[in-house]
Amino acid sequence: DNSPSEGEQTDTPELFTKRYNPDQSFYSKILGQEIKYSVLLPQEYLSESTGKYGVVFLLHGWGGNQSSWGPSGLNIQSIADAQTSNGSIRPLIYIMPEGFNSYFCNRYDGKFNYMDMFINELVPLIDKRFRTTASKTERAVAGFSMGGFGALSIASQHPETFSVSIGLSPS
């Protein structure tokens, strides 16, 4: 686990030696628990040390987890590599957080404020841990089913954070 300890975030992005990093986590003070996430880095990220990249947050469906977009699931690496190599998209960082069955929203009773954690803890953490272009114009959120609902909800409620939202069969 390459995660900084609670309260130990640095301003220097960490070094990574592989593109797909499935076992990342951090402690959320808002939710009072560990939050797992997977990361897919572009090939260029490993071969040079100064470039910055846009970020796409990929949200899973009901019953899924941070591995749902990984090699044994929807395989975002295969899709991203094909689209990058044919020039359809540029190299990007993909972040796949564990969303539980939260719809990526705050609970009505305030007992599980997932969206608050996402905006106030996860996004800033990613901008510190990785070489991101920390700007809403370089940040997107997408998801399928429950994650599609979450992607549309998060971006519509936080246009200061995301410039693109994609809901794939949002439920």
What do the PLM-derived regions correspond to, one by one?
Residues 1-171:
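Non-catalytic cap/lid and distal C-terminal segments of serine-dependent acyl enzymes
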